[in-house]
Design a protein with these regions (language model features):
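Beta-alpha-beta core module
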Residues: 3-4, 64-114
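Short secondary-structure boundary segments
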Residues: 11, 38, 80-83
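Short helix-loop capping/hinge motifs at secondary-structure junctions, enriched
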Residues: 12-21, 99-101, 112-118
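A local structural motif
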Residues: 48-57, 91-92
Length: 134
């Protein structure tokens, strides 16, 4: 499905009350990038705009660390806007990003393979967030 990018911030962040945030608004704050490994290619980055230079960047490979940095450093990350509340209650919010980009969220499956139960469960959960965008 397609999703507009959002900025994840802690609820008391100076930008949290804005209806829309621009990349320019984010410049004074540390950007958090999630990396899968030391040699990850920019082509497989999980965050939009990760190739845009910033003054402060923290690269993490632990999703819990992302939350802790958001809470402790007024840091941010850019993603789909989907953030399960069970990960940190009401402390993390998402604000739409004022950029003309679209994220495409889905999965890749070998043509000779069927989804297992975990994969089917994943798709069911995704569809709850985007029922109009199959």
């Amino acid at each position: 499905f397609a999703a507009k990018p959002h900025v994840f911030l802690q609820k008391d962040h100076p930008l949290a009350s804005k209806k829309v945030v621009s990349v320019h608004d984010l410049a004074p704050y540390p950007r958090l990038n999630f990396v899968q490994g030391e040699y990850e290619s920019v082509y497989f980055s999980e965050e939009l705009f990760s190739s845009i230079p910033v003054d402060k960047e923290i690269r993490v490979n632990d999703r819990g660390a992302i939350v802790n940095f958001m809470l402790g450093l007024n840091a941010y990350t850019i993603s789909s806007g989907i953030f399960p509340k069970y990960l940190n209650g009401e402390n993390i919010i998402s604000v739409p990003l004022a950029e003309n980009e679209t994220m495409h969220i889905g999965y890749v499956l070998n043509e000779n393979q069927e989804l297992n139960e975990l994969g089917k469960s994943y798709l069911e959960e995704l569809r709850k967030y985007a029922p109009a965008n199959p």
